[in-house]
Structures are given as structure tokens and as C-alpha cells.
Amino acid sequence: HGDLVDEQAHAYRLFSWRSVEVANNDVLTVFAGMRLSNDKFSSLLRKYRTLVEAGVDVRTPDGYILRASCIGFTKKLNANRKACYAQQSKREEIRNAMINTMRDLISSKNIADLCTEIISETMEKEIINKCQTIMQIDNVYVTKIKVIKAPVYTVEELKKLHQGRTVQK
């Protein structure tokens, strides 16, 4: 994953790629999933905050069916109070906002654009902006994207998908 981002501080997203075809010296791969590293996930957990998790199954325009999971925490606003908990109704509203945002953004992007969007954290920023009116949240991350169903590509389609995209050794 170090090849996907410029800074190692942002290398906590672990992408999985599945090898499909070997053509000459090139290995053609397809997206197989993404998850946060265990170190990053463990560092997010905090006391005196409410954890909100959401998950949704979404179909991309290029035929993938993905299961995306998201996590977020309430943000401490008052410096005098130790805890910052959310009521159940607020948690449900935040969860619905997370689900709707993930569904909208994933269903409108093909898998290559989705990977670049995940790396640039635009989905997380969009979720934080949508939840501003409900309750302040922070540490929002897409924790996992699992491929439920992937389209079957021919060799020609794979070569067309990989045109102009090479990773040097």
C-alpha cells in the first residue's frame, strides 16, 4: 500500500488485489477489498465517547457488489465535561447519514475511482459534513470494504482496464 499514497502516515489502509491473468511480464489484478490496519483501528477506540458503526451493501456501475463498513465517534465539545455520549435517536440519525452517504458515493463511482476516493478520504469528509446538523462527530473512517460479487472480465477487458496503469519494481 505504500505505493498508493505518498506519505507513510496515511498507509493504514490495506488494499487487497486478486491476480487474474499473467500477460508477458505483467500481472493483471482486480480489486479484492480494503480494511484498516489493526494498529490504526485499535488507536481509534476511546473512552467516554459513543461509537457509531454502519454497514451497507452497494452495487457499483461496473458490476461490483461491495459491503462497506464505516465507524465514527462523537466529538467532545465542552472542555469541562468528561464524557460525550449520544442518545439512541442521534445514533440512529448518524448511522442513517453514514449509510446514505456511502450508498450515494459508492453507487456513482467505478472501482478505480472509488479506490482513489477512499485514499483521499473524501467519503469520510462528506459523512462528517452531513452529520454536522445532527451531532459533532470525528474519527470517521471506512473500516472495511468487502467484495461480495465481482464481475468476470475477459483478458481483453482486463488489458483495457489496466492501460496506462503500471507499478514499477
Show which residues each predicted segment covers:
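Positively charged, low-complexity, intrinsically disordered RNA-binding extensions
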Residues: 92-169
